[in-house]
Amino acid sequence: MNSKIFAVLLLLALLSCVLSDQYCPKSSITACKKMNIRNDCCKDDDCTGGSWCCATPCGNFCKYPTDRPGGKRAAGGKSCKTGYVY
């Protein structure tokens, strides 16, 4: 009986996570000098602890998702490299 209750609670918790929309946070920076552009990540797998790889004017950084839209996830791709981009 206890295992059935636990299974139902676990299913409800997973369902609420899947149904809630998550976004990269909106960047407060609108522009960045080219010499300061740096990528800490290129894809979500480069980030730890449930954070996402999000694009900003100053590069890609690992950020925790938020429920407010406005940010942009990093596109990644073969041309993306970590470190300074200049």
Swiss-Prot record:
InterPro entries: Elafin-like_sf. GO terms for biological process: defense response to bacterium. Residues 21-66 form the WAP domain. One of its GO terms (cellular component) is extracellular region. Its main location: secreted. Keywords: Antibiotic, Antimicrobial, Disulfide bond, Secreted, Signal, Toxin. The keyword Secreted applies. It is found in: Secreted. Contains 5 disulfide bonds. This is U15-lycotoxin-Ls1d. Belongs to the venom protein 11 family. 01 (wap-1) subfamily. The lineage of its organism: Eukaryota, Metazoa, Ecdysozoa, Arthropoda, Chelicerata. Has antibacterial activity. Residues 1-20 form the signal peptide. GO terms for molecular function: toxin activity. Disulfide bonds join 24-54, 32-58, 41-53, 42-80, 47-62. Expressed by the venom gland.
